[in-house]
Amino acid sequence: MTGILSLGAVPPEKKSRYGSLIAPQLLAPYHQHFFNMRLDLAIDGINNTAYMIDVEADPDDADYNQFHNAFHINKIRLDTEKQARNNLCLEKSRSWTFENNSIKNAIGEPTGYKLYPGDNAIPFSSSKAWWRKRASFVNYHVWVTPFNEKEMFGSGNYPNQSQHDTGLLKYTEQDRSIVDKDIVLWYTFGITHIPRQEDFPVMPVVTAGFALKPNGFFDINPANDIPKAIKKTNDECCQNIK
């Protein structure tokens, strides 16, 4: 993001708890930016399943954990739309995978892709705020729905004219099954902007985003272009050359 800040004038020597002075008598309010991405997944086919991955430390007093550093993952299948509504959790290093259970990779696991969240935020406005009533996609970072060609926008078709949410909150209240279905991932991410003097008069670029990376989709690193060895012994150094 970049652009020009929305500013307000304040009396000399006056400060505000709701914004930053970025020049004499110029106040830039604190604010947030939120984005919602609709990702129509098709991982090795259209029938996919979503999983939430939480990391958990093992008990400190366990006999097998004498070095006190063991941890494991809990892989939770998300069966319905309401179950899939979740937020990031740093305490659990939470992530999500999306898999095709009918297609197996070289080690017999489902092929899939993994969501790697980037920088994010939660809304500080109350749920009573009008913008949140109209754009409830900010309530959760992750939503999953079955594909529906009429459900194209996280905040519904006409959010500026609505009296309540007509988007993701309404869609997911149906609580439809999302197991082995043609599913859509909706990812919400945001930035909390506390303006600084360096943002004036024109902001430098600020980035936000996420990554969707293969997770067991390929059998090895697909960028590895070294051919497999064909000789079984080290007797001949040039056996691969023909």
Q: What spans do the regions from the language model cover?
A:
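Extended effector regions of multi-domain proteins
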Residues: M1-K242
